[in-house]
C-alpha cells in the first residue's frame, strides 16, 4: 500500500503569459509532490522545480505525473535532489509519466540522479508526445547504488522505459533493464567498472553530432558516445565513476542549446 492516503499525482500545464514568458496555467498535486513557482534565470527560459517532500520511494509507492508544455513555451524542469529508492521488500515502487510538448515549445527535463538502495525494485514508464516543431532534452542518470558505502548493484531490479512520439509516430524507444541477479553488471558490456550512467535524448535541438562528440571527448572521467536516431535526432550514452562528470556534461550540452534558442542568454 502507498504510505499516502491516495496515489501520488502531479499535473502541470503551462502557457505563454502576458509578458511573453512561460507561466503555469494549471497545476494539481498530492503528497509528497509540490511545485515551485517558475523563475527566469535566463530571459524567457522558465525554470520549475519539482519537489517531493519525502525521504524517497518505498514499497507500494506509485507516482502518476502528467506534464503539458504549451505552444511556444521555453521551460526547464529540475528536481530538488537525488532520488532515492529504498528497500522495497517483496514489492516495488513505480512511476508513470506522460509529457506533451506543444508546437514550437522547448522542454529541458533535467532531474537529479536516481539511486536504488539495497533490495530496491523500481519500474518507470515515460511517454513523451511531440509536435514536428517541438524541441526536447530529456535525460536520466542511474547510479549503481550507495557508492560511498560500497553498496554497488545490491538493488533487486530497475526497469525504465522511454517512448518518444513525434506527430503520433514513434521516433525513439529505450528499454533499460538492470537486474543484478541475472547479469554481471560490471562486465564490459554493462557498466565495465563505472558506477553512474547517463541517458540523454535530444530532439530537434540546434546542435550537431560532432559538437556533442567534442563535448564528450573533453569531459574528464567520462566514457561516452553520441549516435543519430530517427530524423537526425541525437542520443547520448555515457558512463562515469561519479555523478558530477555526467551532470557537468549534460549541463554543457544544455547550455549550448539554450544559448541558441534564447539569444539573449
From Swiss-Prot:
Keyword Nucleus: no
GO MF: nickel cation binding
Main subcellular location of this protein, as a coarse class: cytoplasm
GO cellular-component term (any): cytoplasm
Keyword Cytoplasm annotated: yes
InterPro entries recorded: UreD
UniProt keyword list: Chaperone, Cytoplasm, Nickel insertion
Family matches, as Pfam families: UreD (PF01774)
Subcellular location: Cytoplasm
Membership in a protein family: Belongs to the UreD family.
Summary of subunit composition and partner proteins: UreH, UreF and UreG form a complex that acts as a GTP-hydrolysis-dependent molecular chaperone, activating the urease apoprotein by helping to assemble the nickel containing metallocenter of UreC. The UreE protein probably delivers the nickel.
The protein's role, per its UniProt record: Required for maturation of urease via the functional incorporation of the urease nickel metallocenter.
Protein name in the entry: Urease accessory protein UreH
Origin organism lineage: Bacteria, Pseudomonadati, Campylobacterota, Epsilonproteobacteria, Campylobacterales
Amino acid at each position: 500500500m502507498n504510505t499516502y492516503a491516495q496515489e501520488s499525482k502531479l499535473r502541470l500545464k503551462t502557457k505563454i503569459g502576458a509578458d511573453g514568458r512561460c507561466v503555469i496555467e494549471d497545476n494539481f498535486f498530492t503528497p509528497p509532490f509540490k511545485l515551485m513557482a517558475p523563475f527566469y534565470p535566463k530571459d524567457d527560459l522558465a525554470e520549475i522545480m519539482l519537489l517531493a517532500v519525502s525521504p524517497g520511494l518505498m514499497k507500494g509507492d506509485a507516482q502518476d505525473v502528467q506534464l503539458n508544455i504549451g505552444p511556444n513555451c521555453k521551460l526547464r524542469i529540475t528536481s530538488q535532489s537525488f532520488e532515492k529508492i529504498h528497500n522495497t521488500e517483496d514489492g516495488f515502487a513505480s512511476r508513470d509519466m506522460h509529457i506533451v510538448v506543444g508546437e514550437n515549445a522547448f522542454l529541458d527535463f533535467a532531474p537529479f540522479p536516481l539511486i536504488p538502495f539495497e533490495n530496491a525494485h523500481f519500474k518507470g514508464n515515460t511517454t513523451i508526445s511531440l509536435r514536428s516543431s517541438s524541441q526536447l532534452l530529456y535525460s536520466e542518470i542511474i547510479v549503481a547504488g550507495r557508492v560511498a558505502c560500497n553498496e554497488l548493484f545490491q538493488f533487486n531490479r530497475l526497469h525504465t522505459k522511454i517512448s518518444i512520439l513525434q506527430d503520433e509516430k514513434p521516433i525513439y524507444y529505450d528499454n533499460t533493464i538492470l537486474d543484478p541477479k541475472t547479469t554481471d553488471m560490471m562486465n564490459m558490456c554493462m557498466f565495465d567498472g563505472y558506477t553512474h550512467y547517463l541517458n540523454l535524448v535530444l530532439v530537434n535541438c540546434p546542435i550537431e553530432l560532432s559538437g556533442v562528440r567534442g563535448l564528450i571527448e573533453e569531459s574528464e572521467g567520462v566514457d561516452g558516445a553520441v549516435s543519430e536516431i530517427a530524423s537526425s535526432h541525437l542520443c547520448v550514452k555515457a558512463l562515469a565513476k561519479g555523478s558530477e562528470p555526467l551532470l557537468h556534461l549534460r549541463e554543457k550540452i544544455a547550455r549550448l542549446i539554450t544559448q541558441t534558442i534564447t539569444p539573449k542568454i
